[in-house]
Amino acid sequence: MLLHVGMKVMRYQSYMGMSTNHETEEVYMVSIYDFTVRDREGKDVSLADYKGKVLIIVNTATECGFTPTYADLQKLYERDKDKDLEILDFPCNQFGQQAPGTADEIHSFCTGRFGVTFPQFGKVEVNGEGADPLFQWLKKQKGFTGFDPTHRITPILTGILDKADPNWRLTPDIKWNFTKFLIDRAGNVVRRFEPTADVDAVVRPAVEELL
């Protein structure tokens, strides 16, 4: 099914890392440009390289109901990359194990199927004890904003989350694949878009305000 709804809730809890209780208590970086991430080859990349650009940072998966979002993001990237928009893609396997491949396999899939040309980085965790420091910091800047109640997948997502953790709405945890953080040219996290947010109708206008 679209979101592998038949998966066991315990499996979901195990791989999602619902609670942030075990995450690093303090993320000392005060700017997004203080962070270093790993590219697909495991090499360090300083986010200071992206100073002055508008960024979308997104956790992704290749076997998810939201995977076609890649096409929407690529369309947005082609439209605005010459205006200094960058989309930084971080595959994550925490949500139902829907990003099972290696970084190179994921890249090959995305370029072949969706023509992706924006930067893709190494796989990360975004919740729990092993959460990447960048995503710990992003969640502290912008918490959960709620799903689009009109989206057809929202009832499925809320059902899964309710079973996994009745208090999921109260935490800043990333809830699913394709959660997007919008960063302005000064490095401020200005918006968080849940996976149900339409890229063309909701994300693109917010991006264009910053370009």
Q: Which residues does each predicted region cover?
A:
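Thiol-based oxidoreductase modules, predominantly thioredoxin-like and allied folds used
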Residues: 84-101, 117-128
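Short loop/turn microsegments at loop-to-beta-strand junctions
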Residues: 32-33, 55, 177-179
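Thiol/selenol-based redox catalytic cores and closely related redox-interacting motifs
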Residues: 109-197
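Conserved helix-turn-beta segment immediately C-terminal to the redox Cys motif
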Residues: 53-54, 62-63, 67-90, 111-114
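N-terminal "domain-start" segment that seeds a small globular fold
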Residues: 15, 24-48
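Non-catalytic, surface beta->alpha helical segment in thiol-disulfide oxidoreductase systems
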Residues: 191-211
